[in-house]
């Protein structure tokens, strides 16, 4: 009864929670297994951000429930789906023995002890707790990179987003605690630190009454073993001149930013309640572009309620004009409990998918042209693996799992975690080929 497996779905922020649960379980003598068939207990850390994520979470619960016919004794759901559907989830999915919300995952050991006694456990309704400080992590990423969560929750009130209800209001972690965790990760061999939160750029606003991300980055860059610091989930309205200067002048911060913009049309931004304007977005992009070698990733949403052909055309032209190196396009997901749920008219699924496809076609060409422009240049690559006779890794331009890869041809023996400087010799739509 000591084998536990965790399946972590959704975003990297969820992965960090899973890593903390793993550490708590290991501390109490549980064996962590990667093969679900060998597990006595399976924990599914769920996502419920959009419809597809909910479906995936439910499919995993049903699929893992099948294992109860064999070795598996207990099945537990944690994370956003649990927080959102709590009682309904445990009622509709009888294979679940426990449902734990986002603020209660630190009680995982006690919950397992409870279900062993034959009880069904339901814990939710505390998303505002920030009670996981000081809990170690068992990394589920390769040893050379790790995510560093600097805040929990979100106080932005975007009309399409359920996250504030599932994760509570914005809560920055104390800077000294973040630094301590980063030092510990670096001691364990982490070379790339990826900064995450629902909104990284709001860091400090609640705790220190001012935006403190530039200072935090400055402190993190003093950690000797770290080579790359990467920033994800930046919001345009909080990208200050001070932050831009820090990114520009700090050698350890990679010249890459993930800045979800969602739309370009003033009227759509207003309906989305994004708290920013087209002018502000244009200003921020222009300032970020002043940083040599800057690579920008963004995400856009199509099919938001009431999105007209004109508003969509505006977005198309914006993408063509700004030529972002990395773009993700989502179709709007109508979520109960959000303001946009009641907005009219809702856009037909067929139209949403067509718009998504159109944008991705435009972006594919932009990405290809950008990659082609890299042929003949030198790039530093973090090696991640070897397959079919070639190494592969990422350059500063690529965040793990969401961006492309650099394939590296080399006669030398290379290892995951090595940094090598390659000459780019070929390019595809999303990947590069280099020689070393």
Swiss-Prot record:
SMART domains per UniProt: Elp3
MTTase N-terminal domain boundaries? 2-117
Residues annotated as binding [4Fe-4S] cluster 1? 11, 47, 80
Domain called TRAM: residue spans: 372-436
The record's GO molecular-function terms, alphabetically, read: 4 iron, 4 sulfur cluster binding; aspartic acid methylthiotransferase activity; metal ion binding; protein methylthiotransferase activity
Keywords, comma-separated and alphabetical: 4Fe-4S, Cytoplasm, Iron, Iron-sulfur, Metal-binding, S-adenosyl-L-methionine, Transferase
Q: Please state the Enzyme Commission number of this protein.
A: 2.8.4.4
Q: Which InterPro entries match?
A: Elp3/MiaA/NifB-like_rSAM (IPR006638), Methylthiotransferase (IPR005839), Methylthiotransferase_CS (IPR020612), Methylthiotransferase_N (IPR013848), Methylthiotransferase_N_sf (IPR038135), NA-bd_OB-fold (IPR012340), Ribosomal_uS12_MeSTrfase_RimO (IPR005840), rSAM (IPR007197)
Mind naming one GO cellular-component term on file for this protein? cytosol
- Main enzyme class: transferase
Tell me its family: Belongs to the methylthiotransferase family. RimO subfamily.
Q: What does this protein do?
A: Catalyzes the methylthiolation of an aspartic acid residue of ribosomal protein uS12.
For this entry, the protein name equals Ribosomal protein uS12 methylthiotransferase RimO
Q: Which organism is it from?
A: Caldanaerobacter subterraneus subsp. tengcongensis (strain DSM 15242 / JCM 11007 / NBRC 100824 / MB4)
This protein's encoding gene: rimO
